[in-house]
Amino acid sequence: MGMIFVYTILSFPKIYMSVIEYKFEQYKTLGPIIYKKEKYKLQVELLKLQEDVIKNRRRIALCFEGRDTAGKSSTINFFSEHLRPSNFRYIHLGIPTKEEKNNWFQRWEKHLPEEGKIALFDRSWYTRALTEPTLGYCSKKHYEEFMNNVNRWEDKLISNGIEVVKFYFSIDKDQQKRRLSA
């Protein structure tokens, strides 16, 4: 039983990807004191990142994707808990309108971060490929258009100075079932 955590960092001129698999058993013995110390260290690093983003007028889009109950919202809450509210935005878009279905990337462009800001996306443009086809929110044509254009669109973001960090959270079906029934 475990959780798979994948992240990808897109920024000029490099693309970096890592896959980390966490086994829950490793963390069951983590006591509250050690947990608080580790959490504090991580939050200090997030504040340092935000200060650098502000100082250097960076634009960072953090995209959180994954299975339901895998921990996306909890992680976003952790990331943003001590950040300066004026320099980050939380974005969670619901079911797309008819116009948004036909102008998929424009739907997201209006929420991209400005200079000196961080945008935290609770789900991202990848819902077009990951969940919308199974929920009936997009046609095969929309799906294929997305798949044919997403890399070019992300290249445009990067060339415009936006750093994109994508996280994907996955848990096994048994763990997901337990969480949904809790």
Regions found by a protein language model. Give the residues of each.
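Methionine residue identity
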Residues: 1-3
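Glycine-rich phosphate-binding loop of ATP-dependent small-molecule kinases
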Residues: 7-182
